[in-house]
């Protein structure tokens, strides 16, 4: 039996990442699921996992090597153990999971505690793709178990192969924290139903009384034995239980060697979970059929971009980055209905969640406009629905308010979509939502300092310190935390809202907001050449006060909306270029976090395309590699990856809602994009390897006279050509 088991493994790994021997690799075959899954620091790395789902899938499925929490994902490539397999909704390393559960195939004695059930992770048996994952392990009794799973958006299909086992079983953990969950075992139907009410971020947002994720598990084999457990105490034969730390188990006949489990998930109820499972996997489709369909779906999306002149490593890094941008925001609706975590009702319509807006407004959302335009209106509409259901658009929906980060960057996402032609939502409702961000301070604004990740105080933070910002033109450091960063980002959001106001004819708002978009000037200290905190009295505060995830160098160039004005403040083009050079040459630039992601493209406003082109290769090489530690910072729901994609293609969305891209330089000789609006864009840089700079840029044969190109021209398709003459 063991020899047969290992032979099956050999076949399995042959087929894991490719269609067949001798076949040309497809884009999906280049994806390395483990890039960014570890790093030199416990939290400062990619924070990615080899989770399996459909593009933008509602529920992801992932091997667990540790207990996840805020600041730790469930999988880390440096770990040497396996504690289970999870249905998870944790979107990022610094955000919490919710509505999750864990399974662990076992043999012999039941082990419920994560430390007791941990087994060595056999890395040489592990294989992960966007649509499939497998790994094998050895149980304490010496028997071997292979786990495989594939997934759709709301469902999954697991296959457990038990070799040399006289007591095959599956352990299930439905809850492990205060909110807990419940489990019901239905042996007559070979079925388990469970729910989980936990939200790791619950202390950062409002209480949800009706929240739960429901799961329906259908087994291919009957249960020979079953029971539940709470806090490690086992109740043999018990069919149901509910508690903070709760789970169950099922045993199979001693001669069972393969068990298949089909799982549906839902935030509505068990009936919807079963319906999702029926729609996406059903009862008749085989594991191989579901896996093949998942591969086809991912490959169809990834095939929207083709590349010439790139190495195997380059293609791997690119398509892995592309894959990461197709995970978020994630679907939250279920075939025409969705549970709202804002008013706790069931609504009709389409919904998305997991909007890491402080990060993703910069490049992730602009990238999706090009390659997922069919989802663009629905993603904006989801934000508007949140406003209609709660009175505000959250800064970080996970899945409800969390008061994480600063700024109200849904303003930038919505206005940018509007400027770039996305109009399939209630325009005036969208404008009312972002206008409220600009003109309505949070409740008891001046009573709280609004520290990052403060416990929920009963109100949404929105723009903390907006009261003083509207009076004096800046957020006061003696009243509100993160005052410098907030002032700079409110000014950007004001600019973005102003562009939508202008388009909709709200000219009084437009003029007021454009004036406010220059509020960054109020914190610029000409004596130091840096932005600096001010107290409510107008006096300068200490130069290390008021920043978010950085210091004064991190925010020195954090003005996207009025770069000419910033250049003037800093003494003109020559002085500005010199300051940018110092930023890069003296080690001040940090690509591992978002505030500086646009900095290299600021050279475009000084007509120094050559500076952009000579610096980009070094930034790319230092921060993106084909290895588990290949991301220098948290991917943040696709932002790090989207920056890479734009930057290797030769243009970047420097200023949201401006309607234009700044130019860079393609990293490879040719790209071809099948834009999701049906147009095609070709990017050409012939003999790229021979030239460090290619400053002559033409679009459809016409030479560009400045290092920018309109977004709408790119969307219309054509040929963008870089050359030396």
Model region roles, listed by residue range:
Residues 672, 685:
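Conserved catalytic core of nucleotide polymerization and phosphodiester-bond processing enzymes
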